[in-house]
From Swiss-Prot:
Keyword ATP-binding (UniProt): no
Keywords, ordered alphabetically: Ribonucleoprotein, Ribosomal protein
Quaternary structure and partners: Part of the 50S ribosomal subunit. Contacts protein L32.
GO cellular component assignments: cytosolic large ribosomal subunit
Protein name: Large ribosomal subunit protein bL17
Chain's gene name: rplQ
GO BP term, pick one: translation
Family: Belongs to the bacterial ribosomal protein bL17 family.
This protein's record includes keyword Ribonucleoprotein: yes
Length: 132
């Protein structure tokens, strides 16, 4: 019985899942939007949101914790220098999942997961406002 066991298995063993979400979290922080399956996007939220919350208070200890979870110095720098200050006033909910149809090969439901309030979103909204 798998009572009270949270998280999705995604047909992978635990080390594969951990490595996959570490890579996906790094990609999401680096590019601020990625395309993946809906199930992986929902699980990725559980990895990325605590990282951004950690980045809101900049300290050596928090940077080391973030590095231990991502293993990427560039990503840690972006987390603490850009994303932490950007989301300082937001109490959680840093990601958005937008469903985008089915994958061609196997009809898996796909989605974009993006960081809320990324600069491209703000520019697009301003362009729409000026066009009206």
């Amino acid at each position: 019985m798998r009572h009270r066991k949270s998280g999705r298995q995604l047909n992978r063993n635990s080390s594969h899942r951990q490595a996959m979400f570490r890579n996906m979290a790094s990609s999401l922080v680096r590019h601020e939007v990625i395309k993946t399956t809906v199930a992986k996007a929902k699980e990725l939220r559980r990895v990325v949101e605590p990282l951004i919350t950690l980045a809101k208070s900049d300290s050596v200890a928090n940077r080391r914790l973030a590095f231990a979870r991502t293993r990427d110095a560039e990503v840690v720098g972006k987390l603490f220098n850009e994303l932490g200050p950007r989301y300082q006033e937001r109490p959680g909910g840093y990601t958005r999942i937008l469903k985008c149809g089915l994958r061609t090969g196997d009809k898996a439901p796909m989605a974009y997961i993006e960081l809320v309030g990324r600069p491209e979103d703000a520019e697009a909204v301003e362009a729409d406002d000026s066009a009206e």
